[in-house]
UniProtKB/Swiss-Prot annotation:
Residues 143-272 form the PX domain. Residues 60-73 have a biased composition (Polar residues). This is Sorting nexin-1. SUPFAM superfamilies: BAR/IMD domain-like, PX domain. GO terms for cellular component: cytosol; early endosome membrane; endosome membrane; Golgi apparatus; lamellipodium. Residues 35-45, 132-142 have a biased composition (Acidic residues). A 1,2-diacyl-sn-glycero-3-phospho-(1D-myo-inositol-3-phosphate) binds at R186, S188, K214, R238. One of its GO terms (molecular function) is phosphatidylinositol binding. The BAR domain is able to sense membrane curvature upon dimerization. Membrane remodeling seems to implicate insertion of a N-terminal amphipathic helix (AH) in the membrane. Predominantly forms heterodimers with BAR domain-containing sorting nexins SNX5, SNX6 and SNX32; can self-associate to form homodimers. The heterodimers are proposed to self-assemble into helical arrays on the membrane to stabilize and expand local membrane curvature underlying endosomal tubule formation. Keywords: Acetylation, Cell projection, Endosome, Golgi apparatus, Lipid-binding, Membrane, Phosphoprotein, Protein transport, Transport. It is found in: Endosome membrane; Golgi apparatus, trans-Golgi network membrane; Early endosome membrane; Cell projection, Lamellipodium. It is a peripheral membrane protein.
């Protein structure tokens, strides 16, 4: 088509003569083909310089130049003009400083639009939501609020006695009336707070931290027994457990904004919590409801559409089993450490008696000092047993209960899904009933059937939204729970290792101090 176009233009008009060329040199340039080439090149100069050329002519002219490039290359003018389009395409992706600005402005944006944005868009859409969620969770976790539980005090006598704890709060949040305040709370108040929060938030998929478990034996000893070491140990364990429970409550952004939590922390007197006793009617009803829920959960077979929930539930169940095994081992370790402390104390007493009856002065003094060292070691073992319990055993016990609440959140999501499926099945039955009424030609009942269909369609839509909402909440709550769990375990393990290191350093210090006395025995 290039050669044909050149012949047509040569027949209609003659190209202007090139200055400085003689007829002999033109004839030696190659006959008719150079003339066609000359006419094409001259026509190109005319069209590129014209201001009325449309945008659709530029790519056509460019394609017409490509076949000419394979033609005669003996003319120097052809070589320059044939190389110029190649320079345009080669430089278009690198720089924009060329003479033909119109062609560059059309070609360069097309290549940048294809190459750059599609590479950045998927990454931003894929990773940005997770980053925002994590950043939001970090901001939510930074609360300037600290609660402390101190001064357990026995009030009353006999079986009507109870223990009141001083709950102190320090905060700069504008939610509260002052920066520091304190109230008195009994154990049933903590249980009542959990019941209120669980009733409001658990059905929406939130993980409400559970309170410490009841202990009938321990509390009975406190009520009717005298103030001995076992009662003091029980009260200290419960005080620490209540403090951890309340701190987890106020660390949760949703729970902190609940009016019941603020009332619990600020109000001087609370109404008596009902239904918190184990053997009460409400307590027995709760046990029955839990058993019913367990049976119904076994009958529900959910077709999980999101593999994340299925995998995460399996992880939670496996982790709960492993934590139970580890907790049993740590409790055994605590008991062994306490036995070691008792045996060390008996060993110290025996050494002291032996040293007092020894005639050799140096040996008697060495045995007496060894008995003192063993007494110090007995204190170290006792302290380490307490550290084993409060830093490891109690941490594992808390997270065993927390994992049970996490499983309950998954179960609540399953119940919401089952309610949605039941509504869909009911809607299908209503539609089938409407079809039967239409077939039987009963217009008097048809309007009622249509109203019921509209009602159940609205329910299906609402239950579907509820399922989507609780799925979002459970996912976010599990992510937050895992983050808090990692922080808790890190802090407790570091503290536990520091106590072990301190214990070993003290042991080395005691033995190094005693070694010269042992060497001085003659």
């Amino acid at each position: 088509m290039a050669s044909g176009g050149g012949g047509c233009s040569a027949s209609e008009r003659l190209p202007p003569p090139f200055p400085g060329l003689e007829p002999e040199s033109e004839g030696a340039a190659g006959g008719s083909e150079p003339e066609a080439g000359d006419s094409d090149t001259e026509g190109e100069d005319i069209f590129t310089g014209a201001a009325v050329v449309s945008k659709h002519q530029s790519p056509k002219r460019t394609t017409s130049l490509l076949p000419i490039n394979n033609g005669s290359k003996e003319n120097g003018i052809h070589e320059e003009q044939d190389q110029e389009p190649q320079d345009l395409f080669a430089d278009a992706t690198v720089e924009l400083s060329l003479d033909n600005t119109q062609n560059n402005q059309k070609k360069v944006p097309a290549k940048t639009l294809i190459s750059l944005p599609p590479q950045e868009a998927p990454n931003s859409s894929k990773h940005q939501p997770t980053y925002e969620e994590l950043e939001e969770e970090e901001q939510e976790d930074q609360f300037d609020l600290t609660v402390g539980i101190t001064d357990p005090e026995k009030i009353g006598d006999g079986m009507n006695a109870y223990v009141a704890y001083k709950v102190t709060t320090q905060t700069s949040l504008p939610l509260f009336r002052s920066k520091q305040f304190a109230v008195k709370r009994r154990f049933s108040d903590f249980l009542g707070l959990y019941e209120k929060l669980s009733e409001k938030h658990s059905q929406n998929g939130f993980i409400v931290p559970p309170p410490p478990e009841k202990s009938l034996i321990g509390m009975t000893k406190v009520k009717v027994g005298k103030e001995d070491s076992s009662s003091a140990e029980f009260l200290e364990k419960r005080r620490a457990a209540l403090e951890r429970y309340l701190q987890r409550i106020v660390n949760h952004p949703t729970m902190l904004q609940d009016p019941d939590v603020r009332e619990f922390l600020e109000k001087e007197e609370l109404p008596r919590a009902v239904g918190t006793q184990t053997l009460s009617g409400a307590g027995l009803l709760k046990m029955f409801n839990k058993a019913t829920d367990a049976v119904s959960k076994m009958t529900i077979k959910m077709n999980e559409s999101d593999i994340w929930f299925e995998e995460k539930l399996q992880e939670v169940e496996c982790e709960e089993q492993r934590l139970r095994k580890l907790h049993a081992v740590v409790e055994t370790l605590v008991n062994h450490r306490k036995e070691l402390a008792l045996n060390t104390a008996q060993f110290a007493k025996s050494l002291a008696m032996l040293g007092s009856s020894e005639d050799n002065t140096a040996l008697s003094r060495a045995l007496s000092q060894l008995a003192e060292v063993e007494e110090k070691i007995e204190q170290l073992h006792q302290e380490q047993a307490n550290n084993d319990f409060f830093l490891l055993a109690e941490l594992l016990s808390d997270y065993i209960r927390l994992l049970a609440i996490v499983r309950a959140a998954f179960d609540q999501r399953m119940k919401t899904w089952q309610r949605w499926q039941d509504a869909q099945a009911t809607l299908q039955k209503k539609r089938e009933a409407e079809a039967r009424l239409l077939w039987a030609n009963k217009p008097d009942k048809l309007q009622q059937a249509k109203d019921e269909i509209l009602e159940w369609e609205s329910r299906v839509t609402q239950y579907e939204r509820d399922f989507e909402r609780i799925s979002t909440v459970v996912r976010k709550e599990v992510m937050r729970f895992e983050k808090e769990k990692s922080k808790d375990f890190k802090n407790h393990v570091i503290k536990y290792l520091e106590t072990l290191l301190y214990s070993q350093q003290q042991l080395a210090k005691y033995w190094e101090a005693f070694l010269p006395e042992a060497k001085a025995i003659s």
